[in-house]
Amino acid sequence: MIPRYSRPEMAAIWEPENRFRIWFEIEAHACDAQAALGVIPKAAAEAVWQRGAFEVARIDEIERETRHDVIAFLTNLAEHVGEEARFVHQGMTSSDVLDTCLAVQLSQAADLLLADLDRLLAALEARALEHKHTPCLGRSHGIHAEPTTFGLKLLGHYAAFRRNRERLERARAEVATCAISGAVGTFATIDPAVERHVAEKLGLAVEPISTQVIPRDRHAAYFATLGVIASSVENLALEIRHLQRSEVREAEEYFAPGQKGSSAMPHKRNPILSENLTGLARVVRAAVVPALENVALWHERDISHSSVERVFAPDATIALDFALARLAGLVEKLLVYPEAMQANLEKLGGLIHSQNVLLALTQAGVGREAAYAIVQRSAMKVWAGEGDFLALLKADPEVTVEDAELAACFDPASHTKQVDAIFARVLETQEN
């Protein structure tokens, strides 16, 4: 991922130094287990820890000749360890190192993403509570529908990201497995106790059954989860973009002193963060299909999955980490305009209360189809600019509801009377 959309801690997970450090730990812990089993001398295992080291540049140099990254690493490691290096990697295959390392890296990435989600959830909850009773328009198909509150809008996104957090916890647990089982997963040349020891030291579970590789359905579920989270990011970003339209302007991104929106038009205040998040969501989702396609490999293994994972695993996790942090900051500083929300509520002259009128007529004994036609007749006149909705209804002889009851249909509070109950349902579920 390019530096522009990278944060240091997540990017560091995918740097060669971290990858080779994990490789070293896998090999060194495996030596400890082999020594405990009497397969290699204890002094050899100690030598690996004491003298073991690596240089990224040297590994790259060796790989240019060997065309094999794990062999290049082991060769460089042997240059430091010396004679005892012949006991390193006993009974193991390259995928034992590669796949176990990837499990560690994906676990590390998930931990950062979970922290990102916690910050975002805290921001959404705080802003939702702040605007719990701030009335605003609910829209369907982009058209005014009925009143809701801005707090409810944000609460819906909060609930989605809470579900996403639960999904990511499950995906992390599923992908965090260690496989050190030899050439085709049969443990023919290595004791399963070695796998158990390395898994414990690295904080992983053992892979119950592997081939030469850890089954890629685990990784597919992980990246599918990242794709869902990215779609939730885009969903909220898209809402903010729509609300910041000049014709709407119910909310907008914070515009910092000295910030500029256009090289040509000094007046512009553009939703650039939300637009950026929409784009980054596409980058993250781009990993989902390749991850699914990696599930099907030839027999006990081929390397068709390897090149793709080396690209999309860093890119997807780094991009999502950046996006979640940016979205949290956006929510924390989001500018909200209740006056504009109220003005938009009143813009259509009461049409947003049409369902209340429909229900009042049916309660008064009018058939639903007939009631719908009566209400729609007046509503279409309002759309055409031919009058006020309430006045037109009062003047309609087919509207049999008393004026006081009709006026009550236009009470905005009737639409939001269950807000407290909805908040309690969402937030109490969190506590339980």
Short names for language-model regions:
Residues 1-187, 191-197, 206, 259-262, ...:
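A helix-coil-helix interface module used to build multimeric assemblies
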